[in-house]
Swiss-Prot record:
One of its GO terms (biological process) is cell wall organization. Binds 2 magnesium or manganese ions per subunit. Pathway: Cell wall biogenesis; peptidoglycan biosynthesis. This is D-alanine--D-alanine ligase. It is found in: Cytoplasm. It comes from Novosphingobium aromaticivorans (strain ATCC 700278 / DSM 12444 / CCUG 56034 / CIP 105152 / NBRC 16084 / F199). Residues 104-304 form the ATP-grasp domain. It is an enzyme of class 6 (ligase). Mg(2+) 1 binds at D255, E271.
Amino acid sequence: MSLPKLHVAVLMGGWSSERPVSLMSGEGVAKALESKGHQVTRIDMDRDVALRLAEAKPDVVFNALHGTPGEDGSIQGLMDIMGLTYTHSGLVTSVIAIDKELTKQALVPHGIPMPGGRMVKTADLYKADPLPRPYVLKPVNEGSSVGVAIVTAEGNYGSPISAASKGPWQEFDQLLAEPFIRGRELTTAVIGDRALLVTELRPKSGFYDFDAKYTEGMTDHICPAEIPDEITEACKDIALRAHRLLGCKGTSRSDFRWDDEQGVEGLFLLEVNTQPGMTPLSLVPEQARALGMDYSDLVEAIIAEALKDAGKA
């Protein structure tokens, strides 16, 4: 893929819990663009971001932010007001996709299989279990498994849950409780209007948490996943349908849990990530690489999608 030489502002950092990941993603993107001869302005997201974007006057903004405010519609709304062309999804899609409950409301009526569950106030956890054990607790709008916990039948956080157990959810006021789905972690990337591959993730710690995601050697990535063809095709179909239904742009990544004793009936979409990581260990670059697309070409492909959507390509 060949792009004209562009001035690209790379937005990274910010103040969410995923700041370290965003900085790694952003620096990787910036170096890739420079290797292709593009002019790059690095912007570490802060409260003066509008001024810095206005001063930079970029041809396009590469959004390498993760979490709030780069993934929840905030920065997208600002860039819309400023008339900037930017990568990845727009305001409405971002608002919906970062909220796991809103995502369910948008996708389940269209036949996308997602786990059941319910919203629960953190304070109510210490009164009674919201679901039969085992179940999963997760913040409604965090990524990278921040704040996620599996509550086991053995009472790993007490029975009932004890505030003294210092669960990772305690800094959040509201949580989503979902039934725990035994089985395997799968993920599928979409670029443009094409689902790539399916990767199976096998964390050596048993849980695919923040450290397992971003520490080299802590998770085995099997790409393409060694799973039945019908599961591969189901993952790709669901990922592409979810991408389209939510109105995602550029790239997205759909994460699944698969109970391999249940066949295709055991496959559930957990979430759609509209700002998937672009670090050396990240899954979208890995799948692209397995299909013969190197990292710098992937970055340019994402920018090309943004230019096309803006009518500039």
